[in-house]
């Protein structure tokens, strides 16, 4: 392709809306253009990158036995109501674009396709002889993000590969899941990315197990906790660890103590001259279920720990049936104003104890009559503990479970793992932290959707059995930007060879020099004929502008038909290393073929 004929506009200044380097680079280099909040046009160079990523994805999915299809973007609300996710996606999380057609039917623009594909399977899969089967698509998805940002990282419209497997049973699912794990690792390696596979929370998708694939980058939105021995890695939302050893309480007798101005753990520990590990803090949450019931949740956790609200949300979803509900619509820590809806009197925030009385809750049909009390594992073995006295300015000391108040029946791991914690698999290993960009996620869904939507098959014994499902996603457009976030410098993008829009660019420094033009045209044709995708910068611009643009757009190899022509050579510059070499004109093709094959082999 000749740059003089391409829609190609670069910017010298960073765009005002761009916050992270990859976003700045892609806009400045003319790859993407903002159309609206979280909405971008993929310009010709970007489209070539996306096609290359998609092709690598397609090849590895096909090799793993998956079959490509295309599902509708418009999805009937009825399917999502069958699965129980319509309210979650349109009200609780509010990420689905929902609309009503002229027949007054509700529809959603697909953020994901579990319901649609399950409906297809329900209609078409009848016998065990048809299983397992794995279907995938590459298409545009839609999410009504609260705060679209970072370009293609968190947009309202994005390209994704999503696959869905239908399996005989859990054992069969594990085999497919493993095949997808291998395929994903191959995809990310071939794309030239440094990545880490980590344990992950399944979120609104659901399922028994899931794993994320993180591209390591300082600007990553996710925190990954891992050990140096490479035997453990997890998203902080999912991570588990051993808490720090507790320090014994200095109080041996039960007493109520006046503790003015101690509504934080730090101030209380300082006032009482005790360790935070001897304190039980009680965190109050307000949760609204899709049945319309508001439940007040009291979480008791050790003073030196923080509540992992993702773990808490998952536990509250598991408790939904107690309140004739399927999911939660909202979860928050209530402030004084919010309490007026359900509290008979203001609560002593900062001084709450685990025995906060239920009669503080107003009697109303939409308010649960009792607190849902949950204890984190860290508090169960504490003795002579310190906690709130349910009175502003007072705490209890020397208290014990079973004697001074009842230990909640619901005991769950709700603590947030932290850097420096000891690892469960080896206490000699401590958790370290890195930032990551999630580019892939695989789930063992199990029977969640097949049972909810009545997708059954007949097994060998003639019995009707729910299909065991898995789902597997890759953010194609996000992956492309993540590659930039991982590999750039002050001059612009450094594309991995495998997904670069072009592998080489031939630059003519001076269009008035007939020899430069002739040699460039010849090399341009030879390289393309040899299968090396090559750009020709034949624009009527100064040489400095062309060199800057070549660096900015990140083409892996730059060939310059300049002063070296006098000795029958051209200058060849590697974008990644900036190493410049003089190569004989008749050796350029073989030189680049060798260089590219070495890079591809290492990936």
From Swiss-Prot:
Pfam assignment, any one: HGTP_anticodon
Catalyzed reaction equations: tRNA(Pro) + L-proline + ATP = L-prolyl-tRNA(Pro) + AMP + diphosphate
Enzyme Commission no: 6.1.1.15
PROSITE patterns, per the entry: AA_TRNA_LIGASE_II
Alphabetical UniProt keywords: Aminoacyl-tRNA synthetase, ATP-binding, Cytoplasm, Ligase, Nucleotide-binding, Protein biosynthesis
Keyword Protein biosynthesis in annotation: yes
InterPro entries: aa-tRNA-synt_IIb, aa-tRNA-synth_II, aa-tRNA-synth_II/BPL/LPL, Anticodon-bd, Anticodon-bd_dom_sf, Pro-tRNA-ligase_IIa, Pro-tRNA-synth_IIa_bac-type, Pro-tRNA-Synthase_IIa_type1
MF annotations from Gene Ontology: aminoacyl-tRNA deacylase activity; ATP binding; proline-tRNA ligase activity
Gene Ontology CC terms, in alphabetical order: cytosol
Top-tier EC class: ligase
NCBIfam families to which the protein is assigned, alphabetical: PRK09194.1 (NF006625), proS_fam_II (TIGR00409)
Known role: Catalyzes the attachment of proline to tRNA(Pro) in a two-step reaction: proline is first activated by ATP to form Pro-AMP and then transferred to the acceptor end of tRNA(Pro). As ProRS can inadvertently accommodate and process non-cognate amino acids such as alanine and cysteine, to avoid such errors it has two additional distinct editing activities against alanine. One activity is designated as 'pretransfer' editing and involves the tRNA(Pro)-independent hydrolysis of activated Ala-AMP.
Annotated domain remarks: Consists of three domains: the N-terminal catalytic domain, the editing domain and the C-terminal anticodon-binding domain.
Subunit structure as annotated in this protein's UniProt entry: Homodimer.
Family: Belongs to the class-II aminoacyl-tRNA synthetase family. ProS type 1 subfamily.
Protein name: Proline--tRNA ligase
Gene, per the UniProt record: proS
């Amino acid at each position: 392709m000749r740059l003089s004929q391409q829609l190609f506009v670069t910017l010298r200044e960073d765009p005002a809306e761009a916050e992270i380097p990859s976003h700045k680079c892609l806009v400045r280099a003319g790859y993407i253009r903002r159309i609206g909040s979280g909405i971008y046009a993929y310009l010709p160079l970007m489209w070539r990158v996306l096609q290359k990523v998609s092709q690598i994805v397609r090849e590895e999915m096909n090799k793993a036995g998956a079959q490509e299809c295309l599902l509708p973007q418009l999805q009937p609300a009825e399917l999502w109501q069958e699965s129980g996710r319509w309210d979650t996606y349109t009200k609780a999380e509010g990420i689905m674009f929902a609309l009503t057609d002229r027949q007054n039917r509700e529809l959603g623009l697909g953020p994901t396709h579990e319901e649609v594909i399950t409906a297809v399977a329900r209609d078409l899969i009848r016998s065990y002889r048809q299983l397992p089967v794995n279907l995938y698509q590459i298409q545009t998805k839609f999410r009504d993000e609260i705060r679209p940002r970072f370009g293609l990282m968190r947009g309202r419209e994005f390209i994704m590969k999503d696959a869905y497997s239908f399996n005989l049973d859990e054992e069969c699912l594990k085999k497919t899941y493993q095949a997808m794990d291998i395929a994903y690792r191959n995809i990310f390696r071939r794309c030239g990315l440094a990545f880490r596979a980590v344990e992950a929370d399944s979120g609104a998708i659901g399922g028994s197990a899931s794993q994320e694939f993180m591209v390591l980058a300082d600007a990553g939105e996710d925190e990954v906790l891992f050990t140096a021995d490479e035997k453990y890695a997890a998203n902080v939302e999912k991570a588990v660890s051993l808490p720090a050893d507790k320090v014994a309480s200095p109080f041996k007798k039960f007493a109520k103590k006046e503790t003015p101005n101690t509504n934080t753990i730090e101030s209380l520990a300082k006032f009482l001259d005790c360790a935070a590990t001897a304190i039980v803090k009680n965190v109050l949450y307000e949760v609204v279920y899709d049945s319309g019931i508001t439940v007040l949740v009291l979480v008791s956790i050790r003073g030196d720990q923080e509540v992992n609200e993702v773990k808490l949300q998952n536990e509250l979803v598991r408790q939904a049936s107690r309140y004739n509900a399927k999911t939660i619509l909202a979860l928050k820590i209530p402030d004084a104003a919010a309490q007026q809806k359900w509290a008979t009197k203001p609560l002593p925030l900062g001084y709450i104890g685990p025995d906060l009385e239920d009669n503080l809750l107003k009697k109303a049909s939409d308010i649960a009559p009792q607190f849902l009390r949950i204890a984190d594992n860290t508090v169960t073995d504490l003795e002579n503990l310190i906690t709130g006295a349910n009175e502003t300015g007072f705490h209890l000391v020397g208290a014990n479970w079973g004697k001074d108040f009842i230990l909640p029946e619901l005991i769950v791991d709700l603590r947030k793992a932290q850097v420096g914690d000891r690892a469960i698999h080896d206490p000699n290993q401590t958790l370290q932290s890195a930032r990551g960009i999630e580019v892939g996620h695989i789930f063992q869904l199990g029977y969640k959707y097949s049972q909810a939507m009545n997708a059954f098959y007949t097994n060998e014994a003639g019995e009707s059995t729910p299909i065991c499902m898995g789902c597997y996603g890759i953010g194609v457009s996000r992956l492309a930007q993540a590659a930039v976030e991982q590999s750039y410098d002050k001059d612009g993008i450094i594309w991995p060879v495998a997904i670069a829009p072009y592998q080489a660019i031939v630059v003519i420094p001076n269009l008035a020099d007939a020899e430069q033009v002739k040699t460039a045209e010849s090399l341009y044709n030879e390289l393309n004929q040899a299968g090396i995708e090559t750009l020709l910068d034949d624009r009527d611009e100064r040489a400095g502008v062309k060199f800057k643009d070549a660096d900015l757009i990140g083409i892996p190899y730059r060939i310059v038909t300049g002063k070296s022509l006098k000795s029958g050579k051209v200058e060849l510059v590697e974008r990644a290393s900036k190493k410049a070499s003089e190569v004989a004109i008749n050796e350029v093709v073989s030189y680049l073929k060798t260089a590219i094959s070495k890079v591809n082999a290492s990936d």
